[in-house]
Structures are given as structure tokens and as C-alpha cells.
Amino acid sequence: MSTRRDFLQGTIVSAIGLSLPTAVVNATSVTTRRTSPPRGFADLLRAPDLVSVDTNSGIQRLVLGAGARWQGASGLAVDTRETHGALRIGLMSPALGVRRLHLRWRTRMDTARLFLGDAWERGYGDLEWRSLAPDRAMPWYVATWDGTFTHAYGVRTGAKAMCFWQVDPAGISLFADVRSGAAPLQLGDRTLSVCDVVSRAGHAPESAFVALHAFCKQMCAKPRLPAQPVYGSNDWYYAYGRNSAETFLRDAERIVELSPAHDNRPFAVIDDGWQPGRGADKSGAGTWEHANEKFPDLPGLITRVKTIGARPGAWYRPLEAPTSAPASWRLARDPNALDPTVPEVREKISADLTRMREWGFDLIKHDYSTYDLFGRWGFEMGTSLTKNGWTFSSGPNRTTAEVIDDLYATIRSAARNTLIIGCNTVSHLSAGYFEMCRVGDDTSGTEWSRTWKMGVNSLAFRATQQGAFYTADADCVGVTNAIPWALNKQWLDLLSRSGTMLFVSLAPDALGAEQKADLARAMAIASVQQPIAEPLDWQRTTSPERWRLMGKDRAFDWSGEEGAAPG
């Protein structure tokens, strides 16, 4: 059992300084429109050349009228107005249900050699610069590179639609999915602010990484960031749910021993395994009022962890339906998940998080909410996102993105100043709500190839979001005897010097003198803010081996003696 998906299937710039090089900082003050745009840059602040809308009565191609308003039949209209450095997209449809908007700008895009998009939630080892593929859906933003310039196009964080891009030789298209679950959106008299389209022209000689990081900062005006670098332990990749009060205390003691003695204290996180449903009584799944019998006095245990010198954290699954939940609370797509549009469900989530905060947890990692809503992992969502035939309890009057926004706002409000890690969250919608985001799928304490694929890839291709959207979490170093230390220590070294967060899972029988020395060195580095790691060969591979770390170029060997395991 090496992944959380395996387990599921088996059981049915802030106070934290970015310390960026001057070139990166200067690159953030770029205007979005120029009188003479550089080669290959598409001006997306102008009116699109085509606007069409997929409705419950068919696809309508709208006609541009006065005042940047595109008009169709039955009162259907789309506004495309430039405001505050963006093209703001507004939707009105008093009579027709709407599935998706398509906006297209005709412009030559075939001068670019490579293209990079983002992911709906986490990366799955599948992020990469690729040559032109017209049907490739790229969530949230797309960067283009022609060998000199890196141009970028996207929507600001906090969009009210699930947005993706497609690029072909003759133009660039934005698709905005405004469905409510799988049902056409019924707006009535409401006007939906769909998204804000932004773009950034590249400059020579900035690298593609510097350009994309600057664009990520442009897309998110107000990231919520922790006051200090985040580092510590999480027990999942050695315990895999077989944790207890004793292992929690032991982990806290060990991470404190390995960490520097300054005021930025390490975290000790109990992952999945402490809650009632993972104890002897399986009927407690989805309840969080108390811990299971393995943690008989959780509030007292939390106090002991703090006395040891660690900051306690815990895992939480907000949309898991308790067996006692009434049918009215359950999601139409899957009754095992809660429907967050139900007021009582939001009250339950708020009460759960308030309780965990009052117990004394300094960090809460909430998980599974995207899977519980859509019924698909990020790599399965594609352009359809979810299966057909369902909507939310409140009716199809709000987009799925709006429902997610309400859920995240509920979590944030209840957590107050407790740090939040979003795992399996919609990254572009979580920015500004949560301090940290798991940017890739699970690494492993049993399979090196999985850590190599998921961890290295997600760090390389989403480190551009570090400090711009949130603190990026490329996942843990699973310190166990199942993975050769010669390989794992490289992942540890990269993460510790990356400027992102560092968590380790520490199997007691895998901690020899060499491991302890390497871990102590890594914790000392990670506890102080470092410059963001820049992958140097990321345009040639999905798992970069050459990196710029703390101002120096480094090379890693991820292959080991055996190379990658079969997929």
C-alpha cells in the first residue's frame, strides 16, 4: 500500500521573504500591454475574435455589439471588458442553462517551440513542456517558449469557472466550464463574473522559469503565506495509518532532536489514522468529534507535543460522509460524500475545524475534497471534469468553482490563524485561502520510482507558484529501509534547498548515524527561507536533474542502478 489512492480503493510576498534573485524580483513589475509587443506575443486584452456559448439548447455563436458585449438569443450575453490590467469576462443568461464558454483569439502561435500548462489539482508526474498539440487541455494558464522569449496567458486565481486553454497554429482558445456539478448553470437574473484574463510578455535574457514565476505573481494579488518556512515530520510514509499516541510522541521527539534550536519550531503531523473511522469501530468514518482508541487523550497529547518543542498538526477529510448523515446532506453523485452546498454540512465542517483548532493543532491538512466532489483524480478529469447527470442539493444556480470557493472560505474562517495545507485541492482556487498546497501526488516510503516521478516533477514544474500562490508542498521524504538512502538523500537535499516546505516521514528502524546527520543538515537549511529552486533542464525532461539551488548549480542522479520501474 504505497499511495493514498491505493488505500482508498482498498477500503471502498509576505512575512516569509522569497529571497529571490534580483532578476526574478524585477521581472514581476511587467506591464501586460506594450506598444510594440515582442515577437510571438498575443495580446489577450483585446476583444476576442470569437465567443461561443454551449447552452442547454445548443451552441450559440455570439455577435459583438456595442460596449464590448457579445449577444445571442434569449438574452444570452458575454461581456469582455478590459479593467485593471485584465480582460474581465462576464456572463448573463436569464433563460438558458449554460455549460461552457469558448473565447478565441486568432493569432499566429506556431513561432513557439514549447508549451506548458498547469494541473486541475495536483500534478501526477505528467507536467512538462511539450511541442504544439492542438487538443491538449492546459488548466488555468499556458506558457509558450520560442527559444528566447517566454510568454504567458492565464486567468487570475479565484475564477468562478473551471478554466483551461488550448493552443493551435492559428490561435489560442480559453474554455470556461460554468456547470453546476454536471448540470447547465441556471443564472436567472444574476451576472456571473467568470474570470479575469491576464497575459505577460517575456523578456530576454530571463529564463522560462523566472518568466513563469513572475506571471504566477501577476495572477494572484493576495497570496496567504506562512510567517516562517514550514518544515518537520508527517507519519504517513512509514506508518500508512498504523499510528498511535506513542508514535506521535516519538515522531515529535525525533524531529525536535534533528532540528535547529531557534524560534522556528518544526511540525509533527499525524496523518490519516487518528480519527474514529480508522480505529476498531469502522462506523465512525466521517466523524471527528474525538480520536480513536489509539489516541485516548488527544488534547493532552497535543500539549505534550508542544512541550517537547514541536508544533502539532493533523490530517482531516472534510467531505467524508458519516454513516449517520441524513440523505439530504449527501452528494447526488456519490452518497459517500457530503454536499458542501447544504448549510448543515458547512456547519459540520466549521465545527470540526473549530474543535481541532481548540484542541491545539497548529496545522491542519485537509484532503480528498476534489475527488469527493468530482469523483475523479486530477489526471482523470480532462475537459469533462466529472460524470454526467448530477448537480448539487442547492440546485444548478452556482458554478462548481463557486461551490468550491464557498467550501474553502468555510475552512479558512473556521481555522482562523491555524495553518492550512490543501491536499487534493483545486490549486488555482485555493490560492489566497490556504498557506500551503500539495502540488503533486503522493511520493512513497516503499517505491523510489514513485518519489522520482511525482516528487521531482511537481517540484520542478510548480515551484514557479512558490510564494506567488502559496507555499508549495512537493510532498515528503519517506525515510524507510525500502528505499536506498543514496537515492532518498538526494530528494531530501533538493527539497531542503528548494525554498519550498520540507516534511519527512521517519521510520524508527531506518535512522542510522548517516541518516540522522543528513536529516539534521537538511532541517537546518529548510528552517531558514532559501531562494526558490530553479530546474535548469526542465524543457528537456519531466524529471530535471540539473538545478540552481541557493545560488549554485547542482546535478542529481535519480536513476540509480535500476532506472525507473514500469508504470
Q: Language-model features: where?
A:
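Secretory targeting signals
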Residues: 1-2
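N-terminal export signals
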Residues: 6-27
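Cleaved targeting-peptide boundary
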Residues: 28-34
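Carbohydrate-recognition beta-sandwich/jelly-roll modules
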Residues: 37-266, 363
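Residue-level signal for short, function-critical loop segments
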Residues: 237-239, 318, 500
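Aromatic- and carboxylate-enriched substrate-binding clefts and catalytic-loop regions
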Residues: 264-481, 515
